[in-house]
């Protein structure tokens, strides 16, 4: 992610500050004070931030004919073992929050008579779990359970999951490399045994530039 005003510093991101009218977007972003779309809107930066969904959607849209839609639920500093736990969510209770967002967003499409197909689930998280010993050592097990519950709750047994690699090039990654590695190993273990889950290498683009941060990636 980066700030809209910084886009001009990074030519590959040129134009992402503008709305993508051909892409539908439903979202709930933040911790205590969430920013919600309250329905489907054009894909655009939220809170002056350029999220990964913007470049992702532009890339996909250039390579397929059908229109796409993205549902995003995100909050920084959350744990898979806690906030995102599908069985006993704590604190920000991200799993039930996201499930409700997905169901309400899809229901709105149904009401509008729009046909759709859920293509996949993108998951990029894990840094905060390394600070809790139990969460860190059980990350793979928790991720496997997380994936299983999503497939059950959406009634899509073969729902595809794309698990983004964690970056070890930032300050967190350098100082806490063994713990980051433990999380990554848990992710890799799941994708090696699940034919519908794929591990997506991203560390080659990991970077943190500027003071304050201009282009930021964990």
PLM feature spans:
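Cell-envelope and extracellular/periplasmic
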Residues: 1-218
